[in-house]
């Protein structure tokens, strides 16, 4: 009986010691992960329950991919793939887009050239992006990168969030227009017709968002944090568009799409917004306004004052978005540093 009593006392003493240890541990970490989750930015749609941009698990492995060397390697890989695909298609009898015919004053010649360009791109683009995505996944694995294949939160289908993103994309296009006019024009190699529409509005958003945001942004974020992931993916997205005006435009759009992806935790919304942006571009091409600025269009109708108002509002939206990006990245960096210190 005495032995049973002594064992019970020993067990109770151990239990009390364990409870004290747990209590002291909780007191050392007064803020939970949920408390550190940033609130939704002003003007954005209401956030879904639970944090959507919490820092990575501090116990997660340290990844080697991607570095800035990897960025150069991936861009080089993309160029090589494009050249190989073009060479194979030429051997198969395909015709490269003819710049002279595309810009011909003869409408019949131009229409045939645009149809041929659309047909060539319709085969070249999916082959190029399919190979690029596959080889990037292999390269990422060999280099020791995070293996996530994107995030697909249903919040990305929130209509209010989508409308906010569309407004932001449209405003950004207006703000960038004067700067892009200082750079050489982007050649019109896209073509016309249903093939060009399907390629730019469906294929390109799906493939490029999966590669740039789903694979590269997540991998870079796992390695160096949200700011690194955002910058890395936007740079790659910009550089692979090659032409100076397209590079600048794609880089800025890449920053915005990356920010929205981080905030929403969803590829759905960035694919939709990318498709919306490309659809606007295709609409302008189809209507014959490919090289006409909004300023020129509105000035021709005596609406210079209205353009000033539109540009001012767009600039305000753009600056607010930039502030939101900066605040979100700063907050995430604090969380990532806190997680690293707690490791």
Mark where each language-model region is.
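Low-complexity, intrinsically disordered extramembrane tails and loops of integral membrane proteins
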Residues: 1-61, 177-184, 336-343
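Juxtamembrane helix-loop-helix connectors linking adjacent transmembrane helices
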Residues: 92-94, 99-106, 112-120, 141-210, ...
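C-terminal membrane module of polytopic membrane proteins
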Residues: 276-343
